[in-house]
């Protein structure tokens, strides 16, 4: 099982990490191998029955899925700088080049090559949405790196749903999304619409 979770004991902020711990331990007792990917691992996690992968240590290398990136941008607010810049042209020329490329209908050929390692706080701070989006990029890389080594993807709560979706698109493996609490459970009627949209996307993508 390739599992994505935002926290894992002993570094937890609530019940999410505790639930992840209990589930991975239960799966291990039934002979299931689990790879648990978290934004930031500290090295003191109990790995007797689970392999913990620190997303902050994963180097993402490859090409960007343009359509998936556009879907992310519709739901997540963060500053994105494209890497397909051309030397010796002005910003206006680059904008015209980019617009023409999109209009040509060849966006499926647009593959920005990138190599990046992201540092995650693993917290619930002001840049949480940005970390959620970057975590999805790392998830895609992990799924590539572990090709043939897992049979199912398990994503815990909305924070990891984009990661689960990305891993599914790369691997073609079935996705299980685990809803520990909905945005309505947490916030009542005054929900965060972006969080709700991510929850909805995760549920729709699940198998």
Model-based region annotation:
Residues 6, 39, 179-182:
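Histidine-centered beta-alpha loop that forms part of the nucleotide-sugar donor binding/catalytic region
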Residues 7-19, 43-47:
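A short, glycine/small-residue-rich beta-strand->loop->alpha-helix junction that serves as a flexible
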Residues 17-28:
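Short amphipathic alpha-helix
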Residues 32-145:
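A conserved catalytic-core segment of Leloir-type glycosyltransferases
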Residues 132-138, 171-176, 184-201:
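Nucleotide-sugar donor phosphate/pyrophosphate-binding loop at the beta->alpha transition
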Residues 144, 148, 162, 175-192, ...:
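A short, histidine- and acid-enriched strand-loop-helix "catalytic/donor-clamping" loop
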Residues 153-154, 204-207:
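A short beta-strand/loop micro-motif in the catalytic core of glycosyltransferases
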Residues 155-160:
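Short His-centered aromatic/hydrophobic patch
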């Amino acid at each position: 099982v390739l599992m994505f979770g935002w926290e894992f004991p002993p570094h937890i902020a609530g019940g999410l990490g505790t639930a992840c711990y209990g589930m991975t331990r239960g799966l291990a007792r039934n002979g299931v191998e689990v790879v648990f990917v978290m934004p930031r691992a500290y090295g003191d996690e109990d790995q007797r029955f689970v392999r913990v992968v620190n997303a902050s240590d994963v180097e993402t290398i490859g090409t960007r899925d343009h359509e998936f990136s556009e879907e992310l941008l519709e739901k997540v607010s963060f500053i994105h700088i494209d890497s397909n810049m051309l030397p010796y042209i002005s910003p206006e020329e680059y904008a015209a080049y980019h617009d023409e490329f999109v209009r040509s209908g060849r966006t499926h050929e647009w593959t920005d090559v990138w190599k990046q390692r992201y540092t995650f706080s693993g917290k619930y701070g002001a840049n949480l949405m940005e970390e959620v989006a970057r975590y999805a990029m790392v998830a895609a890389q992990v799924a590539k790196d572990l090709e043939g080594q897992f049979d199912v993807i398990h994503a815990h709560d909305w924070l990891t749903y984009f990661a689960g979706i990305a891993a599914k698109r790369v691997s073609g493996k079935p996705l299980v999304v685990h809803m520990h609490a909905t945005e309505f459970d947490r916030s009542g009627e005054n929900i965060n619409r972006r969080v709700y949209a991510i929850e909805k996307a995760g549920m729709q993508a699940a198998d």
